[in-house]
């Protein structure tokens, strides 16, 4: 701790990302990265950009990417905001739409960065408990005196998806505040709320290229919503960093968005492997929460999750253990869906425990 720290710095409880050990080669099933390469078209576009154009600043408006996303989602370009990963997009949304003095509602078990943003912007979290089956109950989001609502769909780390009708019920119950729907994993089996954007001016949908498009390394995320909401994010961005996306990321992201056939191929492969992995894990006695993501959330009634995590790590396989002190999920493991070969290696290792 430095004597130059402000009270704000000292009060922060920063996000702890999944471990990235460098001591040896691991089968990485802990950070929900894609086991597959990005679109070949994206790789080709990025290689060309590296070789010829890095002396130039990127387009601060990210016009080509916004146009590609707008076309993909059947929106106007002014309904698209682009940022340096969905985490930056979320941070700007929290700053701009939720730091208004009232609490912000989100689930008690969800993406842990929300609490970090709340602390950073002095927002009081209003935690809405998931039910005993780890479901979000729309009725719990009615009659709230809050600055906004954040819903993760599918939820993380549980992997459960919320039907579109439930998202709409939450929107109807909160017409005077922004409802942010974080859809980082939506391509793996959930219903997107994008179709509701033109009907609900308070809806902001946030997505990423890190998961289904296998581009975690270039850090590109985006928000979709009513043009007025997007304009607010643009004002914040241009008051902080006018060039959030570098030239290489911009061309790679655009090519990936345009390659919808490759997106479908990756998602289909991941879903098929996930369903087989669920069967394999259940055969070993694990209980699996139904998943619409590229991971599964698993617990074993007779085995300690922390010990499983440590043993797997010793054998070169990384899974995510959030800590035995976490209420309700202290004996769960989050397991990213890898290739068929990687998941077979996981199953083989678990059989020996």
Swiss-Prot record:
Keywords (A to Z) from UniProt: Amino-acid biosynthesis, Aminotransferase, Histidine biosynthesis, Pyridoxal phosphate, Transferase
EC code(s) of this entry: 2.6.1.9
Alphabetical list of InterPro entries matching this protein: Aminotrans_II_pyridoxalP_BS, Aminotransferase_I/II_large, HisP_aminotrans, PyrdxlP-dep_Trfase, PyrdxlP-dep_Trfase_major, PyrdxlP-dep_Trfase_small
EC main group: transferase
GO molecular function: histidinol-phosphate transaminase activity; pyridoxal phosphate binding
Essential cofactor(s): pyridoxal 5'-phosphate
Pathway named in the protein's UniProt entry: Amino-acid biosynthesis; L-histidine biosynthesis; L-histidine from 5-phospho-alpha-D-ribose 1-diphosphate: step 7/9
Reaction catalysis annotation: L-histidinol phosphate + 2-oxoglutarate = 3-(imidazol-4-yl)-2-oxopropyl phosphate + L-glutamate
Tagged with keyword Amino-acid biosynthesis: yes
Gene Ontology biological process terms from the UniProt entry: L-histidine biosynthetic process
Residues with PTM N6-(pyridoxal phosphate)lysine: 211
Pfam families: Aminotran_1_2
Transmembrane segments annotated in the record for this chain: none
Family from the record: Belongs to the class-II pyridoxal-phosphate-dependent aminotransferase family. Histidinol-phosphate aminotransferase subfamily.
Assembly and oligomerization: Homodimer.
Name by which UniProt lists this protein: Histidinol-phosphate aminotransferase
